[in-house]
Amino acid sequence: MGNNKFNYKNDNRLKLTILIFICIIFIGIVGFFSTINAQNQQQPEITNINNYKDTTLETNIFKLLKKIFSITGVYAFCFEKKQVIEQNDDGSFSIYKVAGWQKFLMILIGLVLIYLGAVKNFEPLLLLPIAFGTILVNTPIAGIGEAPHGFLYIIFNAGIRNEIFPLIIFMGIGALTDFGPLIANPKLAILGAAAQFGIFGSLVGAICLNLIPGITFTLKDACAISIIGGADGPTSIYVASKLAPGLLGSIAVAAYSYMALVPLIQPPIMRLLTTKKERLIRMENTREVSKTEKIIFPLIVLLLCILFIPSATPLLGALTFGNFLKEIGIVERLSRTMQNELLNIVTIFLGLGVGMQMSAHKFMQAKSLGILAIGLVAFILGTAGGILFAKFLNIFSKKKINPLIGSAGVSAVPMAARVSNKIGIEEDPTNFLLMHAMGPNVAGVIGSAIAAGIMIAFFG
C-alpha cells in the first residue's frame, strides 16, 4: 500500500514537472517570435485593406528554419569553408580555410581507424583514441581542436608539443620489459641494431620523394618519417614532435598501423629471405639471468647513453628508469602504477592528442601518401636487415642463429617476437623461438631510441 502511495505521488510530481516544462517551452517560443517580430516591424503603409496580406510570420519562420539549418553539421559539410585557427611553434597563430567536405572525409578516415582497431584488433589501445581524436577535431563549428581553448588543443599542447607523453609511455614500456633474454645472449643486440637499417635506408627514400611534383620534404621531415622503420610508436611521435610537428598525425598513424600489421607484413619477407633449413635451426636454451644482472643492466645502458649519445637520454632515461623500478623490487607500487594506471591514462591522452593533428588541412596532402609509402619501405627494410644480418653472423659462428629471430629486431614488442616464434613453429612444432626472439626485440627498442637520438643531435 505504501509503495502505491509513493508511486502515486511520484506520478503526480512527474506530470507537474512535464506541465511546467511544456509551459516554459511555450513561453520561450512566444517570446522568441515576439522579439523577431519587434525587430522586423516597419512603419505601416497605407494600403487597401482588401488587398492586404500579412507575410511577417511566414518570413520569420523561413528565417528561423534557415538559421537552424545553418548551425547543423550538414550545412557545414556541404556549404561552409571555415577558418581554422592554429598556433605555430613560435607562439604565433595561423588561419587556414578548410572546406566542409574535407572535414567529412577525415571523419570517414576516423571511422576506418575505429574499424581497424575495434573489429580487426589492430593496436586498439592507441588506434581507437586516435580515431576519436580525428573525428572530434574535424567536427565543424565546435572548435574542439582550435587554439587556444579547444580541449584537444589543450591536450596536445600539454603533453605532445612538449614531448612529455611519449616519455611517460617509455617509462611504462620499461616497467613492462624483461631484458633477461638480451642479457643472457648479448650478441643478439647486434640483430636489434641491424634492424635499424630500415630507418637510415628510408631516410634516403624520403629525400628522393622530393623528385615527385607536389611533395616537398625537408631533411628534418625525412628524418621524422624514416623513424617509422623502427616500428616504435612513442619514438616516432617523439622525433616527429621535435623535427616535423606538422607531420605528426600522419607519422603516428603510419607507425602504429604498421606495428599492428606486423603479423601480415613480416611473414612473407621472412619466408622469402630464409630457406627451410634455416627456419629449422634450433637454438640452445638461454642461461638463467640473476637478479643482480637485471638490476645493473638498465644503469649500465643509461651511463653509456649519457657518455656517448646524450641526445638519446630522454628516451632511454625514461625506459631504464621504468625498468630499474621493476627489477629493484622495493617500489612495487610505483612499478605497478607505471605499468597500469599511468601508462593507460597517458595512452588515452596521447591518442587524442595525435588525433588532433589529423585535421583536414594537415592530412589531406600528397605528403601523407608519401609518408605511408616510405613508412612501409622503412619497415620492410628493417625486417630484412635483421634477417640478413643473422644469416651473415651464421657464416662465422659455430652456434647458429635462426634467422627468423632477426626480424624481431624491430621495436614492435612483443608482436615481432611472437611472429618469429609462430613461423618457427609452423616449420617445427617443437622449435620454440619466443625467448630467443625477445633478445633482439628489446634490443630494437634501445636501438630505435639511439637512432632517434642521433637524428635529433644532427638535425634537431
Predicted feature locations:
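Transmembrane helical segments that form the transport core of multi-pass membrane transport proteins
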Residues: N50, D54, L302-G386
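Alpha-helical transmembrane segments
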Residues: G246-L264, I374-G382, I405
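Alpha-helical membrane segments and immediately flanking helix-loop junctions
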Residues: N157, R161-N162, M171-F179, L191-G201, ...
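Hydrophobic transmembrane alpha-helices of secondary-active transporters
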Residues: L113, L136, N162-I183, G322-L325, ...
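Entry/N-cap segments of selected transmembrane alpha helices
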Residues: L182-L203, A360-G386, A437-N441
